[in-house]
């Protein structure tokens, strides 16, 4: 790879953005960042706490700033939060500053991958599937709108998906 380009991973909760992102960064010798982890690092608290204390609006404000800061770096792989796509500012930054890869997955796979994860505030409800379906209606068209590449993550290991991304990007 002659120049260091940014790769931004978008997609719903449970698509594998963080896991695939780590593999991708390692394989391409790029720096890996996770926007949720960066928010936790900056606040000194976990995402659930930020949601409890500041609400979703406060969390989204922090997320917008973190993504703006991280996308100014060069030579990174960034795993974004599933809901970050709803911010026009974030969509603009992702589109303008790197290659956007949409990691697509089914609702069934999302449910299976997130059912035991207590760190997902939006899913701490009686029927997480219903929440995921509603979020998909809103967010999937936005992921598709800004994606340079779309890769399905169902039934594949993170390493296989990372290799598919590399192949599709021609790296």
From Swiss-Prot:
Catalytic activity: shikimate + ATP = 3-phosphoshikimate + ADP + H(+)
Localization: Cytoplasm
Annotated residues for binding of substrate: 36, 60, 82, 139
InterPro entries referenced in this protein's UniProt entry, alphabetically: P-loop_NTPase, Shikimate/glucono_kinase, Shikimate_kinase/TSH1, Shikimate_kinase_CS
CC cofactor: Mg(2+)
Listed SUPFAM superfamilies: P-loop containing nucleoside triphosphate hydrolases
GO biological process: amino acid biosynthetic process; aromatic amino acid family biosynthetic process; chorismate biosynthetic process
Major location category of this protein: cytoplasm
Pfam families, per database record: SKI (PF01202)
Record note on cofactor: Binds 1 Mg(2+) ion per subunit.
PROSITE patterns: SHIKIMATE_KINASE
Cited function: Catalyzes the specific phosphorylation of the 3-hydroxyl group of shikimic acid using ATP as a cosubstrate.
Family under the similarity heading: Belongs to the shikimate kinase family.
Name recorded for this polypeptide: Shikimate kinase
Species the sequence originates in: Shewanella loihica (strain ATCC BAA-1088 / PV-4)
Lineage of the species this protein comes from: Bacteria, Pseudomonadati, Pseudomonadota, Gammaproteobacteria, Alteromonadales
């Amino acid at each position: 790879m002659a120049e260091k380009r940014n790769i931004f991973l978008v997609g719903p909760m449970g698509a594998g953005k963080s896991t695939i992102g780590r593999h991708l960064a390692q394989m391409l010798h790029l720096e890996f960042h996770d926007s949720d982890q960066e928010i936790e690092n900056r606040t000194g608290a976990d995402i659930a706490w930020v949601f409890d204390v500041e609400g979703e609006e406060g969390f989204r404000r922090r997320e917008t700033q973190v993504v703006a800061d991280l996308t100014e770096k060069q030579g990174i792989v960034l795993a974004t939060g599933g809901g970050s796509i709803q911010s026009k500012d974030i969509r603009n930054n992702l589109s303008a500053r790197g290659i956007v890869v949409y990691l697509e997955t089914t609702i069934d796979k999302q449910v299976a991958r997130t059912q035991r994860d207590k760190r997902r505030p939006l899913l701490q409800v009686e029927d997480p599937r219903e929440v995921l379906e509603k979020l998909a209606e809103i967010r999937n068209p936005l992921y598709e709108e800004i994606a340079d590449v779309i890769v399905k993550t169902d039934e594949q290991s993170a390493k296989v998906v990372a290799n598919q991304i590399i192949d599709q990007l021609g790296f």
